[in-house]
Amino acid sequence: VLSASDKTNVKGVFAKVGGSAEAYGAETLERMFTAYPQTKTYFPHFDLHHGSAQIKAHGKKVAAALVEAANHIDDIAGALSKLSDLHAQKLRVDPVNFKLLGHCFLVVVAIHHPTLLTPEVHASLDKFMCAVAKELTAKYR
């Protein structure tokens, strides 16, 4: 459960990420595909090379979903409901991949904003990413 402090911390991160969200989304995917090659299996039709237009486009979607969740932090389930349906019913992505994506997003934020990611903010952002992963897999059951 996200505390009031967690919510403030998460909103602060997304305020800083701001205009770079799309680039961070693409970088997050590139890191995930490199560090966890098994995640590539869901993207057999993608050009997975650095700077690929497909990774950039999907990174934009990932970033938009995270921003949407942060903007509706009191109703993450509602904000991600359609995306949860898509991943559970059509795409059938292994739920562990959302945790891997969350970890890679934390790394990207840490690289670009090292002073922002204090231990407290890190914990809050990790809890937020876990909440996002939980909602994206909620309809698998």
Swiss-Prot record:
SUPFAM superfamilies per the UniProt record, alphabetical: Globin-like
Start and end residues of each Globin domain: 1-141
Single Gene Ontology BP annotation: hydrogen peroxide catabolic process
Keyword Protein biosynthesis in annotation: no
Molecular-function GO terms, alphabetical: haptoglobin binding; heme binding; iron ion binding; organic acid binding; oxygen binding; oxygen carrier activity; peroxidase activity
Tissue expression as described in the entry: Red blood cells.
Keywords for the protein's UniProt record, in alphabetical order: Heme, Iron, Metal-binding, Oxygen transport, Transport
Protein residues bound to O2: 58
Annotated heme b binding sites: 87
Entry GO CC: blood microparticle; haptoglobin-hemoglobin complex; hemoglobin complex
InterPro entries named among the record's database cross-references: Globin (IPR000971), Globin-like_sf (IPR009050), Globin/Proto (IPR012292), Hemoglobin_a-typ (IPR002338), Hemoglobin_oxygen_transport (IPR050056), Hemoglobin_pi (IPR002339)
Function summary: Involved in oxygen transport from the lung to the various peripheral tissues.
PANTHER family per the UniProt record, alphabetical: HEMOGLOBIN FAMILY MEMBER, HEMOGLOBIN SUBUNIT ALPHA
Family: Belongs to the globin family.
Subunit structure: Heterotetramer of two alpha chains and two beta chains.
The name this protein goes by in its record: Hemoglobin subunit alpha-A
Organism the protein comes from: Phalacrocorax carbo (Great cormorant)
